[in-house]
Amino acid sequence: LISAITNQLTVPGRSTGPVAFTIFDPVGLGQNFDGIMHLADFEERVISSRIWTQQAQFEQKLGELNEHIEKVTQMYLRNEYATLAEYNAQAGRMAEKYHFLVIADFPVNFSDVAVKRLQNIAASGPRCGVHLLIHWDQRKTAPVFPHRAPGLPRSAEIPTILRRFFPTV
């Protein structure tokens, strides 16, 4: 997957467009994404300066992505556009970036705060151009999502929006 993304975005003469990646790699400490770091050779801002590995960093970066979603919703989409793609089609050179949050070995190093922020991103992010690519290590205990109705079985802890990505959980 990472190789395909890298190949598509680094074709000579092709603009990457407004795209940014935020990458979490708590187990590999960045090694799982060595190849994608070459994108920084073409455009430094495409990768948010590094690969993040620590719990506090995850909380901070997820908070920043939540703030970005708030900004896009309130300043760009308002009641005029259903999605960031619609806004960008009209914005031309003022187009807003698409963000990809890439997570390896979820839920390692995810605090309750980080899980709640991730849930908000999963629910509201796609409309605002923030998309998730998550490798869920199913050998680890699944986190308890805060927006769960009491009395639901453990399998129902994963909200519907995330179950699309993880149907076997």
Language-model segment annotations:
Residues 1-81, 91-169:
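P-loop NTPase catalytic phosphate-binding loop
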